[in-house]
């Protein structure tokens, strides 16, 4: 089922699961939406970037600088596996988690995947003064966001069960209410989930 931009798009139909995964690009507002949804769904909220930072003892940008992106992605995959193995969690995923095929498969198997989609210009305004995003370094932030969107959109769509489009001026209460309405209709929460892949 499709709906107008600013509403939502259902991609994969019902996905029985006890877990909810938020995916989307940097600056989409996943952390904010996750914090809003978690108490209303009675789920613990786990932000994978914060988990990785706690385990590494340094911020994401320093992990990228000292260890490289490949090391960060390995940490990210391990954190995803660890925190989605048990049922009943809301996971806020980093923007690049979809770059690995194994992560995309695991997301599809272990939870209902909601893609928070926000335009690059809107995200560029939000991130203009944010120096913590290692893949956004450079002079042309908007161009970099558009480049990442072009590369990753197909992967977001591959593992998403539904898409929530955010409008430019929407506050978190309005966005959260739309997310809850979508989940109420299309998330068969409480059904059995699949086990770990062989």
Task: Give residue ranges: language-model regions.
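ATP-dependent small-molecule kinase phosphotransfer cores
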Residues: 47-108, 132-133, 146
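Hydrophobic anchor at the beta1->P-loop junction of P-loop NTPases
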Residues: 22
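Hydrophobic positions on the alpha1 helix immediately C-terminal to the Walker A/P-loop
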Residues: 33
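Post-Walker A helix-loop "phosphate-sensing" segment adjacent to the P-loop in P-loop NTPases
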Residues: 39-48
């Amino acid at each position: 089922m499709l709906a107008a931009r600013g509403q939502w798009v259902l991609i994969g139909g019902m996905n029985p699961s006890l877990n909810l995964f938020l995916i989307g690009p940097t600056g989409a507002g996943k952390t904010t939406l996750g914090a809003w949804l978690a108490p209303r769904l009675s789920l613990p909220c786990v932000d994978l970037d914060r988990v990785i930072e706690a385990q590494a003892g340094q911020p994401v940008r320093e992990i990228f600088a000292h260890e490289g992106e490949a090391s960060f992605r390995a940490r990210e995959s391990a954190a995803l596996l660890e925190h989605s193995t048990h049922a009943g969690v809301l996971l806020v995923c980093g923007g690049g988690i979809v770059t690995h095929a194994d992560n995309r498969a695991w997301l599809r198997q272990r939870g209902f995947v909601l893609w928070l989609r926000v335009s690059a210009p809107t995200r560029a305004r939000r991130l203009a003064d944010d120096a913590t995003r290692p893949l956004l370094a450079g002079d042309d932030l908007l161009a970099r966001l558009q480049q990442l969107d072009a590369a990753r959109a197909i992967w977001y769509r591959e593992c998403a069960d539904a898409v929530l489009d955010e409008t430019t001026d929407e506050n978190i209460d309005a966005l959260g209410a739309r997310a809850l309405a979508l989940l109420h209709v299309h998330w068969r929460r409480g059904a059995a989930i699949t086990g770990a892949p062989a």
